[in-house]
Amino acid sequence: MADTTGRIPLWIIGTVTGILVIGLIGIFFYGSYSGLGSSL
């Protein structure tokens, strides 16, 4: 556990990556849903 890559722990990188992926998917679905709703 002591050998961290550089200065950033691996769990922080995983957490940030997961949040970014979930955020992008949420924005994509929200954009498509609101786009379909506004077109009707």
From Swiss-Prot:
Record bears the keyword Transmembrane: yes
Segments passing through the bilayer: 8-28
Membrane topology qualifier: Single-pass membrane protein
Keyword Mitochondrion: no
Entry keywords, A to Z: Chloroplast, Membrane, Photosynthesis, Photosystem II, Plastid, Reaction center, Thylakoid, Transmembrane, Transmembrane helix
Family annotation (SUPFAM superfamilies): Photosystem II reaction center protein J, PsbJ
UniProt subcellular location: Plastid, Chloroplast thylakoid membrane
Pfam family, one: PsbJ
Protein's GO biological process: photosynthesis
A GO term from the CC aspect: photosystem II reaction center
Similarity annotation: Belongs to the PsbJ family.
HAMAP family, per the entry: PSII_PsbJ
Quaternary structure annotation from Swiss-Prot or TrEMBL: PSII is composed of 1 copy each of membrane proteins PsbA, PsbB, PsbC, PsbD, PsbE, PsbF, PsbH, PsbI, PsbJ, PsbK, PsbL, PsbM, PsbT, PsbX, PsbY, PsbZ, Psb30/Ycf12, at least 3 peripheral proteins of the oxygen-evolving complex and a large number of cofactors. It forms dimeric complexes.
Protein role: One of the components of the core complex of photosystem II (PSII). PSII is a light-driven water:plastoquinone oxidoreductase that uses light energy to abstract electrons from H(2)O, generating O(2) and a proton gradient subsequently used for ATP formation. It consists of a core antenna complex that captures photons, and an electron transfer chain that converts photonic excitation into a charge separation.
NCBIfam families in the record: PRK02565.1
Protein name (record): Photosystem II reaction center protein J
Originating organism: Eucalyptus globulus subsp. globulus (Tasmanian blue gum)
